Amino acid sequence: MTKLIYGSLSICVLSYLLVAVDNQVQASCAVDKRSKKITDCLSLAQLGNSSAQLDMSARYFTGTDGVKRNEVLAYMWAKICAKNERGTCGKMINILEMNMSKKEIAVAKEMASKCLGSNLKKCK
């Protein structure tokens, strides 16, 4: 029951965060007339654009816009994003941590570390 409440609360908070940064994120991930292609946003995220990184995290968390829901990848992108933009990305990390096991968080942190160590080239 508690997990269900946290999950519902997480979705509400995430929705608020996404609306708050929606224009900035869409502008960052839009290469051609607000394209929602995952490859466009991924390319920007790998170039270090924190808005695109947050967008990748949100896409993986919600399983929308061309990706399957994957909280580990969502956490990885939020962690990478938090290196440059702690506010919103840090809140995203807090939301994800409420829904993830310690093992999943450890895996996601390791993936983020490898991604950052490769200058954002090996982010899978």
Q: What does each model-identified segment do?
A:
Residues 34, 91-124:
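Terminal, low-structured helical/coil segments at or just beyond the last alpha-helical repeat
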Residues 1-10:
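Bacterial N-terminal signal peptides that target proteins for export
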Residues 55-63, 92-97:
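Hydrophobic face of amphipathic alpha-helices that form TPR/SEL1-like repeat modules
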Residues 41, 46-50, 60-64, 78, ...:
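Short helix-capping/linker turns of helical repeat alpha-solenoids
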Residues 31-32, 46, 61-69, 83, ...:
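Short coil/turn and helix-start
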Residues 52, 67, 89-91:
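TPR alpha-solenoid repeat register
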Residues 15-24:
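C-terminal segment of classical bacterial N-terminal signal peptides
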Residues 31-39, 68-76, 107:
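Structural signature of tandem alpha-helical TPR/SEL1-like repeats
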